[in-house]
C-alpha cells in the first residue's frame, strides 16, 4: 500500500470537483429534433481498485505483463475522450465499493474523491454499495458530488438515505435532452448485502417501464438506463420495455466482444454491445465494461429525429500503461523488454482500436504515491 494520506490530500485538492454536475428533473428547452450524435464512455464494478495492477496480455505476438487499469488511468482516458469528442456522457454503472484495502481503510471516501475528480456525469447504485448498511452508504454519498440515480431503490420517509438519489436525471447534451434512469439488482442486494429495513426494492422491468413512460411524457425520446441489474436482466429489460435506446450494464463483470481474444483474454460469447429489439421493433443496445477499471467502454450512437439509434460505432478499450512491459527471459527471470521491442508493441497498440497505452492522470496518480 502506498501513502495512506489519500483522503486528506484528496479533500483539499478536489473539494469542489464535480459540483457543477446537477441532477436535473425538469427538462430544459432543447433544440428542434434532428439527427444527433452522442458519444458515451462507461465503466462499472471498479470495487475500490484505485491503483493499476499487473496482468499478462498477448501483444504483438508476445505474452507481456503490463500495468492495467487504475482510476488515474481511467481519468486520463476519459479526459482524452471528452477532449476528442463532442456531445459526451460518462457513466458509472455501480459497485464502486468493496474489494481492496482502500475500502477497508477509508470506507468509500477515497473512491468518492477520485470519482469526483473524474467527474462522471452519472453514477447508479450497485448491490455492494449496501454491503455495510445505510450509514456507510450515506457517508460515501455525502462525499460524492456527482449525480446518483436509482429508480427501483426507494428509501422510506425519514430514512437517513432519503433524498440521496433520484430515479432519473435529464441531461441536456448538445442541445438535446437525454433521460438517464438508474436501476439496481434486487434479489442479490436484498439477500447478500445489508440494506436497512427502511429501503424498498422494486422490480427492475416494471420500474424501467414506469420511468421510461414518465420521461416520454416529458417529451424525452432518447433514453439510457444505467443498470446494475446484471447483463441477463438488462437484456430482458431491452426486450420487454419500449422506448429504451441504450442500457449501460453492471454487476456481472462481463468482458464483451470476441475482439479481445487477440490479447489472450476470454470474453463472453456476446458482442459489445449486444443488440436486441424492443417490443415495438426499435433497436436497444446493451453494453458492459468488464471490471476493476481495466476497460473503458466507448461508443458513438447516431440518433434519427425520432430518437431511434440508426448507427452505433463501438470502440471499447483495454487501458494499459505505456512504460512497463515485462517478459520472462530464457532463464525464466522477469525482465523488461528492450527499447526496440517496446516500441514495436507501442506501435501495434496505436493501430488497434481496442487497446490504449495511456499514462496516468498526474493529479490522481500523485494521490496514490
Language-model segment annotations:
Residues 1-4:
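Positively charged n-region of N-terminal signal peptides that target proteins for export
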Residues 7, 40, 44, 68, ...:
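Low-complexity, intrinsically disordered regions enriched in charged/polar residues
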Residues 8-15:
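Bacterial N-terminal signal peptides
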Residues 12, 111-113, 351, 357:
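Preference for short coil/turn "hinge" residues that link or interrupt alpha-helices
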Residues 21-323, 330:
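Acidic, metal/ion-coordinating pockets
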Residues 294-369:
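A short C-terminal boundary segment appended to hydrolase-like catalytic domains
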